[in-house]
């Protein structure tokens, strides 16, 4: 058990990931309140202190011990060469529940078709180290310039190509850019300072947090269904349910009936409930799931 002196310093990503991160934590059971222009959210957990900071800087600060743990992308761990413990993969991003990609992109009219066509060219990017390593792996000599933002507008006048992050590619297409290659796929990770990870209390706190966050991600797009069904024809009814796991079946006072509970993808419910009703199920109700722990 912890005492009031035990506090875990947690870094949360500010910017594009902030809203989706706070929503994920809320689903995991941690409720933050962020005041306007404040970088210090309040939290309904006396054992946590949180600070909002850019994901690009997170791994460095966790490595240095400014934070015990934090959330940042795999890309920024690689870019900053941070020496941290990678506790858990948390596959979510600002607009979806899938990884993002760092891609090599050029103007639609560019003759560049592969990385080897970049010999002697100029590239703009926010991930200079990742890009230089990518060029070195492919034996290409090109200049790489750090971009402070709005990287998509730089080709062709200010750069021959860019290395930029994308979820859907829509921003690149809107700026008339074409993806040549994917350099790196990245997802959010929960990371820990190495010394903090060796502290038993902090490690348990971080591991518990990781479990709950992963459970919240697992529950995305899932709902629970409960119903009563007659034993007659039960096997056929069960076979019609596209469940993640075998349904839980419990006996009722009426020996001719059973109670069924199951977790399914929310997208199938609008078709599934009418099918279940026609198959003889009664008292069907649907409920939300915040966490699904394997």
From Swiss-Prot:
EC annotation?
2.4.2.17
Q: Which domain of life is it from?
A: Bacteria
Which Gene Ontology molecular function entries are recorded, alphabetically? ATP binding; ATP phosphoribosyltransferase activity; magnesium ion binding
Q: What is its main location?
A: cytoplasm
List required co-factors.
Mg(2+)
Instruction: Tell whether Amino-acid biosynthesis is among the UniProt keywords.
Output: yes
InterPro entries, alphabetized: ATP-PRT_HisG_long (IPR020621), ATP_PRibTrfase_cat (IPR013820), ATP_PRibTrfase_HisG (IPR001348), HisG_C (IPR013115), N-reg_PII-like_a/b (IPR011322), N-reg_PII/ATP_PRibTrfase_C (IPR015867)
- NCBIfam families named among the record's database cross-references: hisG, HisG_C-term
Q: What's this chain's function?
A: Catalyzes the condensation of ATP and 5-phosphoribose 1-diphosphate to form N'-(5'-phosphoribosyl)-ATP (PR-ATP). Has a crucial role in the pathway because the rate of histidine biosynthesis seems to be controlled primarily by regulation of HisG enzymatic activity.
Please report the name of this protein according to its UniProt entry: ATP phosphoribosyltransferase
Provide the species name: Chlorobaculum parvum (strain DSM 263 / NCIMB 8327) (Chlorobium vibrioforme subsp. thiosulfatophilum)
Q: What is the gene called?
A: hisG
């Amino acid at each position: 058990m912890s005492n009031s002196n035990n506090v875990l310093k947690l870094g949360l990503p500010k910017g594009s990931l902030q809203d989706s991160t706070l929503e994920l934590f809320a689903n995991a059971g941690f409720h933050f309140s962020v005041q306007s222009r404040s970088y210090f959210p309040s939290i309904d957990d006396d054992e946590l202190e949180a600070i909002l900071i850019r994901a690009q800087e997170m791994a460095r600060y966790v490595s240095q011990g400014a934070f015990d743990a934090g959330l940042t992308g795999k890309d920024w761990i690689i870019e900053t060469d941070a020496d941290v413990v990678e506790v858990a993969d948390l596959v979510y991003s600002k607009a979806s529940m899938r990884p993002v990609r760092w891609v090599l992109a050029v103007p639609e009219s560019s003759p560049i078709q592969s990385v080897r066509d970049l010999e002697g060219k100029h590239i703009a990017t926010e991930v200079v180290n990742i890009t230089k390593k990518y060029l070195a792996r492919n034996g290409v000599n090109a200049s790489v310039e750090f971009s402070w933002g709005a990287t998509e507008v730089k080709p062709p006048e200010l750069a021959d190509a860019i290395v930029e992050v994308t979820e859907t590619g829509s921003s690149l297409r809107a700026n008339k850019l074409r993806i040549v290659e994917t350099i790196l796929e990245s997802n959010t990770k929960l990371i820990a300072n190495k010394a903090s990870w060796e502290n038993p209390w902090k490690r348990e706190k971080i591991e518990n947090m990781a479990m709950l966050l992963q459970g919240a991600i697992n529950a995305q797009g899932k709902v629970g269904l409960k119903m009563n069904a007659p034993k007659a024809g039960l096997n056929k009814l069960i076979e019609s349910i596209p469940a993640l796991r075998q349904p839980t079946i419990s006996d009722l006072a009426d020996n001719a009936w059973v109670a069924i509970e199951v977790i399914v993808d929310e997208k199938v419910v609008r078709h599934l409930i009418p099918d279940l009703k026609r198959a003889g199920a009664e008292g069907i109700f649907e409920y939300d799931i915040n966490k699904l722990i394997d």
